[in-house]
Regions:
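Regulatory input/activation interfaces that engage signals or partners
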Residues: 330
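SF2 helicase/translocase NTPase motor core
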Residues: 1-143, 149-153, 187-189, 193-214, ...
Length: 459
């Protein structure tokens, strides 16, 4: 297929080529993969500035999306790629297979660095691309530590993500630091924290800080510090996107159900005959309350105890209202998945997970009336927008990143219909807190994106 780039795609490609360190905060659906591959091709085969490239990506994206993009576009036909995924034997063979581009899943970064070290091999990647930069926001993770070890040997770094700082500005220290070696935000997280943040939640007994917030003026200063290597574009700025209609479908507990919910909330315990429901701490309590909001909660023996079916009934109503159109249902807890399957099966409504390539193909062909998806597996590279335009959140997630990525499976470039995103919310429960938290995180994220947004008309 012939690639005819949009202006913003051409601009982003040139940005990568002219910036040894580049962080591209591009919204879902803007074509990060083809943009990056086009830049790689030019750097390797035109200017000869790069001779070997490592791409780090989520497993499915590493295995399927990057090789598929090379195969898809005519102008990339001269690139060859080796996929370093699978068992150890397969990975070793892929490492030694002659290629221009090597793609490894992020879970195997530590293994790859160690393999080079143990075998006395020189780290000879002149360019590293991190597809989903937010995967490296945890500076204590093994993947972060091992990639940082080889950073001095790499002359070009590219970070790709659509959701920078989804949980606040603190994450940026690791994300930007892995690219620029700490040049802009400092080499130590403690100094970064001291310079730009102050405690917002602290245990007065021992002085342990639970949460930080930016100091006055710190946000603008952080944005300014990273602006010379960062480009950001929102999909709505550069694409004709279909309308997106978010809705809330509220359900309500009855008096007895509310009593049990409040008991757990206040006492951290619901005593039951054959297995208590308890919460060890505030974090555990939040999870248990989310489960109760959805209708079932795990007891101390790991058994799901059903509290109510209000969300299942709401789901049934929404599927009926879809009038035969395919519906994508997002769930969070494993036992909710089984409850949904059992409920819809009784109603003789076909339901199926989207996991394999065959599932994706059948969904896009309109052959799956109701598809189930977990937000953690609904990430980048999953193209299912052709199969439907209705998403129902049965159970919510705290993660803005996973929430947005799941929504973007349907609301993205290539979608031809108005997208409707239903949120089934149990009134006066932690469900409402989660929605509020997602909205609050989005405010922080939008500030970041706005602060570093590229304006093509000014270039």
């Amino acid at each position: 297929m012939k690639f005819i780039p949009h202006d913003y795609q051409r601009y982003c490609t040139e940005y990568i080529k002219t910036h040894p360190v580049a962080a591209l905060f591009l919204d879902m659906g803007l074509g990060k993969t083809v943009i990056t591959l086009t830049a790689i091709q030019d750097l390797m085969l035109d200017t000869f500035e790069v001779n070997k490239v490592l791409i780090i990506a989520p497993l499915r994206v590493a295995r399927d999306t990057w090789p598929a993009e090379i195969e898809k576009w005519d102008h990339l036909k001269n690139l060859d790629i080796s996929i370093v995924v699978g068992d150890v034997k397969t990975r070793i063979a892929a490492v030694h297979h002659p290629a221009m581009i090597y793609v490894v899943n992020r879970e195997n970064v530590k293994w790859l660095v160690e393999y080079y070290e143990k075998n006395g091999m020189r780290w000879d990647f002149s360019m590293v691309v991190i597809d989903e930069l937010s995967s490296f926001k945890n500076y204590q993770s093994q993947r972060f530590k091992y990639l940082r070890k080889v950073r001095p040997f790499v002359k070009r770094w590219v970070g790709l993500t659509g959701t920078p700082s989804s949980n606040g500005l603190m994450d940026l220290w690791a994300e930007i630091g892995i690219l620029d070696g700490g040049e802009r935000l400092g080499k130590f997280i403690g100094r970064y924290r001291e310079a730009y943040f102050k405690a917002s939640s602290m245990n007065p007994a021992n002085g342990i800080v639970f949460q930080y917030k930016p100091k006055e003026g710190a946000e603008e200063l952080i944005y300014q510090r990273i602006s010379d290597i960062t480009i950001s574009m929102k999909a709505l700025d550069y694409l004709h996107m279909p309308d997106c209609n978010p809705t809330r479908y509220e359900v309500e507990m009855n008096t007895e159900e509310r009593k049990l919910y409040d008991m757990l909330k206040q006492d951290l315990l619901i005593p039951l005959k054959d297995g208590d429901i308890d919460a060890a701490n505030a974090a555990s309590l939040t999870g248990k309350l989310l489960q109760m909001s959805n209708g079932a909660v795990n007891d101390e023996n790991g058994k799901a105890r059903v509290l109510h079916d209000h969300k299942l009934e709401a789901l049934e109503d929404l599927i009926e209202a879809a009038n035969g159109q395919s519906v994508l249902v997002a769930y969070w807890f494993k036992h909710d998945r089984q409850r949904i399957i059992n409920h819809l099966t009784k109603l003789k409504i076909p339901v199926r997970d989207i996991k394999t390539s065959e599932d994706i193909k059948d969904w896009n062909a309109g052959n799956i009336p109701v598809a189930l998806i977990h937000p953690a597996s609904a990430g980048h590279g999953l193209n299912i927008q052709q199969g439907g335009h209705i998403l129902i959140w049965f159970g919510l997630t705290w993660s803005l990143e996973l929430y947005q990525q799941t929504n973007a499976r349907l609301w993205r470039q290539g979608q031809t219909q108005v997208v409707t995103i239903h949120h089934i919310i149990t009134k006066d429960t932690v469900d409402e807190d989660v929605m509020a938290a997602l909205e609050q995180k989005d405010m922080t994220q939008e500030k970041l994106i706005s602060a570093v947004r590229a304006r093509l008309e000014e270039k």
